Every structure is written in C-alpha cells, then in structure tokens.
Amino acid sequence: MSDSKEPRLQQLGLLEEEQLRGLGFRQTRGYKSLAGCLGHGPLVLQLLSFTLLAALLVQVSKVPSSISQEQSRQDAIYQNLTQFKAAVGELSEKSKLQEIYQELTQLKAAVGELPEKSKQQEIYQELSQLKAAVGELPEKSKQQEIYQELSQLKAAVGELPEKSKQQEIYQELTRLKAAVGELPEKSKQQEIYQELSQLKAAVGELPEKSKQQEIYQELSQLKAAVGELPEKSKQQEIYQELTQLKAAVGELPEKSKQQEIYQELTQLKAAVERLCRRCPWEWTFFQGNCYFMSNSQRNWHDSITACQEVGAQLVVIKSAEEQNFLQLQSSRSNRFTWMGLSDLNHEGTWQWVDGSPLLPSFKQYWNRGEPNNVGEEDCAEFSGNGWNDDKCNLAKFWICKKSAASCSRDEEQFLSPASATPNPPPE
C-alpha cells in the first residue's frame, strides 16, 4: 500500500508545480520546502494561501508609486489654487463687477431693441426718395444745405447707431420730408424766377431816379429772399408783392416818355450848374455863410489845413444864433466835432483861429466842469449839448466855414430850396 501511495504523491506534486508555474510563480528551494510542509493539507487551501500571498506582495510593491503620484497630484492642485487666487485678487471689487454686469445686460437689451432689417430698409428708401426730390429742386443755398444734411443722415443711418439716435434721425427725416413737401413745385419756382428776371430787365431800362431805384432795390432783395427758399407763407407773401410790383411797373410811362423826361432833367441840371449858387454842393447855407460838415476825421491841426484847401477856415462862431445852429447840427449826428478855438498860445486864454479872443458871453456854452485841461487838453470841440476841451492830436470830425457867394435876385429866387433840387419822376 505504501508503495502505491508514493507514486501518487509524486504525480500530485508535479501537477501542483505545473499549476503554480501557470500562475507565474517561480519554483525556489524555499518554495519546495514550504510545499513539502503543506503537502498534507487540502489542495484548494494551499492555492488560496498562495494567491493571497501574491496579492499582498503586489500591493506592497505598488504603495511607493501611489504615494508619489498622489503627492504630484496635490502639488498640481496647489499650484492651480495659487494661480486662481492670484487671478481673483486682480479682479475689481464687487461694485465694479456689478457695474460691468449691468452694462452688459443693458447692451444686450439695446441690441435686442434695434429695429428690424425691414425698418432700416424703409428709412433708407425714404432717404433715397428725399434725395431724389431735393435733386430736382433749383440749385439754391438752402436746398444744398438740406441735401448735405440728408447725406450726413444717410451715412449715420448706415452705421446703425443705438435706438435713441435712430429715433432722433427718423424724426428729423420726417420733419425734412414735411419741409420739402411744402416747397413750391419746380415749375412754380421757375415762374417766379422768370418774372423776377423780366421785372429786373424792365426796371433796368428806366431812368435812374429815386423811386425807380427803390423799386429795383426791392426787386433785388426779393430775388435774394426767393433764392433762400423761405417757408411757404413767406413765399406766398413775396409772390403777392411781386404781382403788385409788376402791376406798378406796368403803369409807369412808356420808355419813350421816360427818356424825354430824363433828357429834360439833364438839360435843367446843366442850366443850374451855369447859374450862380450861394454855396457849393454838399455845403449848408445859414445867415450869409456856407458850412461843410466832414464825413471823415482828422486831428485839430489837419482839420485847419483841410478847410484852407477849400478856401475856408475851421469854424469861428460869431453869434448865439450861429452857435445854436452849429450845436444842433453836431448833436443830431451825435459826433464830436472840432471848432476853430484853442488855448495853445497861452494856457487858459482861449482864442479863435482868426486871432479873435473868446468873448465872455460865449463861456456859457462850455459843458459843466469844462474846460478842465486834463492831460494838456488845449482844443475845443462840440460835445453833446455844449463845448469841451480835448487833446489836439485826437481825430474828430470838423466844420469848415466860408462866406456865401452873392447872386442876383432872380437867381436867388430860381435857386430856392424847392427849385434847386430836381423833381423826382412821377409815381
């Protein structure tokens, strides 16, 4: 019996050895001794023991690598946390973030409120129609201004501004469209312009007289006003005035009659030139003297020279009537005007340019507190309702005086103020 058991044990040992080799175990001397010790236990228990032992060995070998991987992973997480903390530190404070968020919300809402493409196309079409309508009007400054404004609005709409801006543009376009609609038709404007041209040509052929010049000036002003394209009510008013002017011009004498009147006036003027006149043209006659009120300004000494060049002298006042007449002329024009009075020769001693002294009765004409000789004021002037002393080197107007010419009685009657001025043409 013992002999038969030994071959079986050897066979079982060989089988166990092959199974263990299939599981990946290498046969060692210790292993053989251990197998020998366990040879008397069940085969399943031996296999389970060896399996647990192998698993423990594998886990023990993996512990160091798992620890290193966990450490590297923690380091990576720490670095990410550090970077995130730094990034959060750079963010603005909470109020700033809320403000940005609100602005984003508003922008999103504004973009959502933009008009649809069809609405934008409608605005663009109205712009094109307005542009075409303005292009048909005559080339006037007001229309060019409208056209430029339309072009600017067209460019602005093309840039799609925010809703409030688009509404403003749309309202302005509506007003412009209404304004263009109120303009007269092209044919009506041409008719007005043609009538203006005809009236201008007709008036241009009339003799140069005050009434006709007034009509001509009014026509020119009306033409300029029509060129600026005022509002409809103003255009109707201008058109009515043009109609009235046209009727008035039609009532004027014929061209041949006007030429006859003009020739007679020319002959009359030539005859008057040959007659004796008390004072030259642009001079004023008063009590046997002629007075010239300048339209330019000079200092006191140059004013004396200017009067001498026309055979006169800087005015010397001889009577209260003459003083009142000259003071009235100066105050009416609201001018500071030199007279021929100074104290240049001796301070405080006033005398006229003809060498005569200032009479005591004339001292009443000085303004209150004058003469005061502030800053070497040595020359007298008409100032307001009286006299004033001022610096002689200042530029002021001046009055020249000379005796009037003597004429016969018939010439004096003929040259009365009523006959000396040519009659205007009949109105």
Curated annotation (Swiss-Prot):
Residue positions of motif Endocytosis signal: 14-15, 16-18, 31-34
InterPro entries with a match to the protein in the record: C-type_lectin-like, C-type_lectin-like/link_sf, C-type_lectin/snaclec_domain, C-type_lectin_CS, CD209-like_CTLD, CTDL_fold
An individual GO BP term: cell adhesion
One cellular-component annotation, GO: external side of plasma membrane
Cross-referenced SMART domains: CLECT
Ranges for the Sequence repeats: 96-118, 119-141, 142-164, 165-187, 188-210, 211-233, 234-256, 257-280
A GO MF term: metal ion binding
Bilayer-spanning residue ranges: 38-58
First-listed, main subcellular location of the protein, grouped into a coarse class: membrane
Domain C-type lectin: 286-401
Membrane-side (Cytoplasmic) residue stretches: 1-37
Extracellular face residues: 59-427
Disulfides per UniProt: C279-C290, C307-C400, C379-C392
Biological function: Pathogen-recognition receptor expressed on the surface of immature dendritic cells (DCs) and involved in initiation of primary immune response. Thought to mediate the endocytosis of pathogens which are subsequently degraded in lysosomal compartments. The receptor returns to the cell membrane surface and the pathogen-derived antigens are presented to resting T-cells via MHC class II proteins to initiate the adaptive immune response. Probably recognizes in a calcium-dependent manner high mannose N-linked oligosaccharides in a variety of pathogen antigens. On DCs it is a high affinity receptor for ICAM2 and ICAM3 by binding to mannose-like carbohydrates. May act as a DC rolling receptor that mediates transendothelial migration of DC presursors from blood to tissues by binding endothelial ICAM2. Seems to regulate DC-induced T-cell proliferation by binding to ICAM3 on T-cells in the immunological synapse formed between DC and T-cells.
Subunit structure: Homotetramer. Interacts with C1QBP; the interaction is indicative for a C1q:C1QBP:CD209 signaling complex. Interacts with ICAM2 and ICAM3 by binding to mannose-like carbohydrates. Interacts (via C-type lectin domain) with CEACAM1 (via Lewis X moieties); this interaction is regulated by the glycosylation pattern of CEACAM1 on cell types and regulates contact between dendritic cells and neutrophils.
Stored PANTHER family: MANNOSE, PHOSPHOLIPASE, LECTIN RECEPTOR RELATED (PTHR22803)
Protein name: CD209 antigen
Organism: Gorilla gorilla gorilla
Source lineage: Eukaryota, Metazoa, Chordata, Craniata, Vertebrata
